[in-house]
UniProtKB/Swiss-Prot annotation:
Keywords: Blood coagulation cascade activating toxin, Disulfide bond, Fibrinogenolytic toxin, Glycoprotein, Hemostasis impairing toxin, Hydrolase, Platelet aggregation activating toxin, Protease, Secreted, Serine protease, Sialic acid, Toxin. Strongly inhibited by PMSF and slightly inhibited by EDTA and soybean trypsin inhibitor. It comes from Bothrocophias andianus (Andean lancehead). This is Thrombin-like enzyme TLBan. Residues 1-112 form the Peptidase S1 domain.
């Protein structure tokens, strides 16, 4: 992050850095098999590796990992919200903004192996 502060290695165990020859993009681990990132990164991925949520320029994408990761001191998924953040509250979760809650049912459906349509 440009202008950001250095953090402890255990401080954000849900952050994922994707390297494709060089640093490619940041993501959020949401369970042992899935990461959440911005859909505008999709043009750089093999098509079978990701799902783009909505054709209406929704900038959200899920990527299924080749194999599940194991939780450890340095690796743990971010807990997805069970209710939307209140207006004006600070989420304090990198890459998890208020709008992500709008897509929570879609995210849960894809992870469960089902399909869902745009809200």
């Amino acid at each position: 992050v440009i202008g950001g502060d250095e953090c402890n290695i255990n401080e954000h165990p849900f952050l994922v850095a994707l390297y494709y020859s060089t640093f490619f993009c940041g993501m959020t681990l949401i369970n042992q098999e899935w990461v959440l990132t911005a859909a505008h990164e999709s043009e750089k991925f093999p098509k079978e590796k990701y799902f783009i949520f909505c054709p209406n320029n929704k900038d959200i994408m899920l990527i299924r990992l080749d194999k599940p990761v194991s939780n450890s001191e340095h690796i743990a998924p971010l807990s997805l919200p069970s209710s939307p953040p209140s207006v004006g509250s600070v989420c304090r979760k990198p890459a998890l903004y208020t709008k992500v809650f709008d897509y929570l049912l879609w995210i849960q459906s894809i992870i469960a192996g089902n399909t869902a349509t745009c809200p």
